[in-house]
Amino acid sequence: IVVHAAALKQVPAAEYNPDECIKTNINGAMNVINACIDNGIEKVIALSTDKAALPCNLYGATKLASDKLFTAANNMGGAAGTRFSVVRYGNVIGSRGSVVPFFEKLVKEGATQIPITDTRMTRFWITLDQAIDLVFEGFERMHGGEIFVPKIPSMRVTDLAEAIAPGVPHKVIGIRPGEKLHELMCPEESAHETLEFRNHFVITPATTYFGDFDYSVDGKGERGQPVEEGFEYKSSTNPHFLTVEELRDLCSVSASAVPVGFSGQKSQTSEGTASKSVH
């Protein structure tokens, strides 16, 4: 199996340097697809992002293109060929370039204000270990062509700032180039293609790539149900928001405190930064 986790992911940087983002996130995706087919890989999962759903920035647009390439790649493999699916999730706690280490650095430096882009901003939230668990569960459940979306909590950026820097005043500095106020993982426009399972959603392929799979029953035998018309899975309307105390625990104590995803089990694997083959 192969996990494709390589990407240029900094939203503002992509706005200023679109060519490098396109080369890595789109051309790089095609390189991985072709290499996997040429080498007879059985299953491939590409990591996606909430920014790929109705993207308003270049990074999200390149990841949407990557998602489309990986799901459509099932055509290239044929009925007995390589199977490709996608796992889409939100912000990974403490990942490189994320807001957690930035806030923590400010606290260590004795900052008297914490910069907040917008007090209304919300994000989906997941730990490193849980993100990896989702990938390996995806391998067990996939038929090929699906986009797996875990049910994960949301957080308010103001709550995160309070968790890391209690009592420190916030300074609103405005949204950065390409940023959204709220993130989306299942857009309303895909509701007719979306199935709900116990701990996750599946966005099914718009076209049949091969065979005659019933996507409502996954590879582990769990049956999903169609979502209601007009359904969307958005960080601002998510029924599960992390509290300040939960955020503080996640940032300072453990990266396994939130029971989310397919199995909710802790993995001992760290997040990768490139495509990986697992034997």
Regions found by a protein language model. Name each.
Residues 1:
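Extended, charge-enriched "interface" segments that sit outside catalytic cores
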Residues 68, 72-279:
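Strand-loop microenvironment adjacent to phosphate/nucleotide-handling motifs in alpha/beta enzyme folds
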Residues 4, 8-64, 68, 72:
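Conserved Rossmann-fold NAD(P)-dependent oxidoreductase catalytic core, especially the SDR/UDP-sugar
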